[in-house]
Amino acid sequence: MAPLLEIRDLHASVGDTPILKGINLTINAGEIHAIMGPNGSGKSTMSYVLAGRDGYEVTAGDILMNGVSMLEMESDERARAGMFLAFQYPVELPGVGGMSFLRAAVNARRIEAGEDEIDQLEFVKLVRAKAKHLSINDDMLKRAVNVGFSGGERNAMRFCKWNFSSRSFRFLMKPTQGLMLTH
């Protein structure tokens, strides 16, 4: 069985500046890894390269997910293949409630998989059960996505979104930043 994610001798640059210089990493299904290092060491660059963000160029090496190279895939294709990137600073979405956002994301995935959309009442029960474990209350779920949220609230909501992701590989940038011990 192929590793979930395999990075082979990855070199990448931003403009004319080389950032990643020969990264090798193998992650098997079910494993949890932490990428740590000082500021400017390439952690964010690696996540952006994995997600296929514009402006980041792979100059050598390969990225394989379940044995398939991702280098020629656009970012949306990488997401459909199983890549999930939770950004350090999630954007605010004024006018879009958290519950509506989560349900739209779940239903988009269900439709793509040929499944029926989830019933609203069933979804509310599911969200409340998952959110409870993250100390997220109904008020937070009704608020516009990330609007006026503290750093800890934003991160708690990132974990909530992550819990609804069916992606096989999740890359969370600074996942504990701003979180209180109760989260």
Language-model segment annotations:
Residues 91-168:
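ABC-family P-loop ATPase nucleotide-binding domains
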Residues 62-78, 146:
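ABC ATPase NBD Q-loop/coupling interface
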Residues 5-7, 20:
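Conserved structural motif at the start of ABC-family nucleotide-binding domains
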Residues 36-38:
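The feature captures the beta-strand-to-loop junction immediately N-terminal to the Walker
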Residues 17-20, 77:
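Short coil-to-beta microelement around the adenine-binding A-loop and adjacent beta1/P-loop entry
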